[in-house]
Amino acid sequence: MSSEKFTVTEHLVPGSYIREYPGSTVTQEDVLKIHVKQYTPKHEGPVPADAITFIAAHGVGLPKELYEPLWDELLERTNGFHIHGIWVADVASMNQSGIQNEDKLSMDCSWMDHPRDLFLMINHFREQMPRPLVGVGHSFGGNIITNLAYLHPRLFTTLLLIDPLIQLSPPSMGFGTDPPGPINYTLWRNDVWPSREAAIRANRGLIHGWDPRCVDRMAKYFFRDLPTPLYPDVEAVKARFDAAADTTATPVTLATPKYHELIAQIRQNFNARDPTTGRIEIPRATHADMDPLVASIPLYRPEPRSTFRRLGTLRPSCLWIVGGATFLNVDEIHEGVKICGSGIGGSGGVSEGRVKEVILPGLGHLMPFQEIGTVVGPCVAWLQQEMDRFRQMEREWGEERKGKSHLVLEKNWYKVLKPMPSGRGKGGRKEKL
């Protein structure tokens, strides 16, 4: 259990201002709160100066607590590195953050907001987050942590991307409007049950093959007791299930309402076609990120494509962990790995040993909750390598800085910038422009 290995501290911090989409909140002046959990290992001895601070991002609608067994396993297998702390925040519209913000949230969601929220969180707690920082992201959390690295290229020493949603095309299982598809399922699914036990039974297909520790956390954090703003009348819900006689059973719903889960997966583009002329006109105030080539489609999601197109510039080194049975487009992930970090401003990419892809055969998109040890294994090996590199770079930088003046420029400046000819301008000087 994480509480046995970590001291768990909860925080509430403000979200970033202004949000990417004006329709994300009821009013644009609403202040959102972000629910954060800080996991500090219960070290027996002093913490090394180079212990890692992890910043993690969860998948769509998946409570941050589901990843606690992953942190337990990572802590147990540390070798060649130490953990200073692990910080995970629920996205503003999901889980505990969403509950805090439910009177302020509206029906739009951008993946670009959470990277800014995390950056705000990091600066807020900077005294508790010494370098090196390592980013961890699963699913759309992998996209989020990558965009945080774009926002501040030198923030992270390395990234661990677990089946990240970074690709040009929609997944092969489809994001179209016709079933079957994840968005169809999300919108039309049942979202209220007569008890927590009934909810777990109804969702057993989702948790099939999960580690029991993750199943326990699913039962605790994925659902929420009624009443809620969506379901304020508990007795009416009980009557719906003919459960009024069972006074001990409390009906539950999803901790992240299905509507917020849906708009995190896909975004509406219902008004691009002018009803009078029939022409497609992108509403720039709300849909500036719409690709004009596909502006006629009613649903889209811009961040996987925009993030993919910038992969060449990714500065931190990066480990991609991909499920062999993932629903994502594996061929496009392979192409993303090839270009990752290879461009101007990037890490150097695969050719310089800064980017690596590991495929885990037989594992699907939810592998952090299935074969936890199998997922942690390549992470540990990669962190050992990258921490060796980090320590070497720190030593070299320290040596280079020895004896340097912090008050005047070094002599090379005077060698490169030649002196001005005498007799120019007033008093022999050329005036500055």
UniProtKB/Swiss-Prot annotation:
Per its UniProt entry, what is the enzyme's top EC class, as one word? hydrolase
Pathway-wise, it operates in: Secondary metabolite biosynthesis; terpenoid biosynthesis
Q: Write the signal peptide boundaries.
A: none
* Catalytic center residues: S139, D163, H365
Query: What reaction gets catalysed by this protein?
Result: mycophenolyl-CoA + H2O = mycophenolate + CoA + H(+)
Residue numbers binding substrate: V60, F140
Give one Pfam hit by family name.
Abhydrolase_6
Keyword Hydrolase annotated: yes
Protein location? Peroxisome matrix
Gene Ontology terms: cellular component:
peroxisomal matrix
Annotated EC: 3.1.1.-
Q: Which GO terms describe its biological process?
A: mycophenolic acid biosynthetic process; terpenoid biosynthetic process
Question: Which SUPFAM superfamilies does UniProt cross-reference here?
Answer: alpha/beta-Hydrolases
Family under the similarity heading: Belongs to the AB hydrolase superfamily. MpaH hydrolase family.
Q: What is the recorded function of this protein according to its Swiss-Prot or TrEMBL entry?
A: Type I acyl-CoA thioesterase; part of the gene cluster that mediates the biosynthesis of mycophenolic acid (MPA), the first isolated antibiotic natural product in the world obtained from a culture of Penicillium brevicompactum in 1893. MpaH acts as a peroxisomal acyl-CoA hydrolase that converts MPA-CoA into the final product MPA. The first step of the pathway is the synthesis of 5-methylorsellinic acid (5MOA) by the cytosolic polyketide synthase mpaC.
- Oligomer status and interactors: Homodimer.
Q: What is this protein called?
A: Type I acyl-CoA thioesterase mpaH
